[in-house]
């Protein structure tokens, strides 16, 4: 039994609040345990120069932690005059994860900006950002679809992300900060509903880990990703019916 009382395969409570802010086409507050992230999706009727005239859209992401989202104040990136390596890595991960869910040709020449602002961090901020941003993305795309229906609905499948790791000798799902900072192995996994992988990030923090342990962790991740997708479906309700249909 973990210090939180959870079983090893149990995720933290998930709460997804849609339309959390007024102006963005999609906005979500996602809470996974004590981790809270505001995710917004904003639409621009243009694409980066390398896509002009291609007929394809683009999805890009920015990630930020507000100064007191952590136990001690974190300096804003703007005050350091550069984005730190961790932030850059995470926002690229979020962008890749969401682009993999979307038919860019069907989207057309539009850019969807995903902004993730961590309000409170207690482990799993990057995975929580992906899971919440997907819901914000669906809301934004649905608003486009309602204004002018797509010939082919561009979102192809659900995407979610979870963390897994080895703490002590136990393989556990959805690590909180207390577990994350002592984990022997720390992994983040992004998956689609059909059980296929988008990204696997894994590190032996103390030493190497075996193929058998890797397989066990990935099995655990699949269970967690399915639970996260169910939370997304519960939040979206009937607004998710177009996903994966490719229909008008």
Curated annotation (Swiss-Prot):
Gene3D superfamilies reported for this sequence: GHMP Kinase, N-terminal domain
Highest taxon, organism lineage: Bacteria
Biological processes annotated in GO: rRNA catabolic process; rRNA processing; tRNA processing
Enzyme Commission code(s) on record: 2.7.7.56
GO terms, molecular function: 3'-5'-RNA exonuclease activity; tRNA binding; tRNA nucleotidyltransferase activity
One Pfam family recorded for the sequence: RNase_PH
Record's keyword terms, sorted: Nucleotidyltransferase, RNA-binding, rRNA processing, Transferase, tRNA processing, tRNA-binding
SUPFAM superfamilies, sorted: Ribonuclease PH domain 2-like (SSF55666), Ribosomal protein S5 domain 2-like (SSF54211)
Residues that bind phosphate: 86, 124-126
Catalytic activity reported: tRNA(n+1) + phosphate = tRNA(n) + a ribonucleoside 5'-diphosphate
Signal peptide from the UniProt entry: none
Function according to Swiss-Prot or TrEMBL: Phosphorolytic 3'-5' exoribonuclease that plays an important role in tRNA 3'-end maturation. Removes nucleotide residues following the 3'-CCA terminus of tRNAs; can also add nucleotides to the ends of RNA molecules by using nucleoside diphosphates as substrates, but this may not be physiologically important. Probably plays a role in initiation of 16S rRNA degradation (leading to ribosome degradation) during starvation.
PANTHER family found in the cross-reference section: EXOSOME COMPLEX COMPONENT, EXOSOME COMPLEX COMPONENT RRP41
Subunit and interaction comment: Homohexameric ring arranged as a trimer of dimers.
Family stated for the protein in its record: Belongs to the RNase PH family.
Name under which the protein is recorded: Ribonuclease PH
Native source organism of the sequence: Clostridium perfringens (strain SM101 / Type A)
Gene: rph
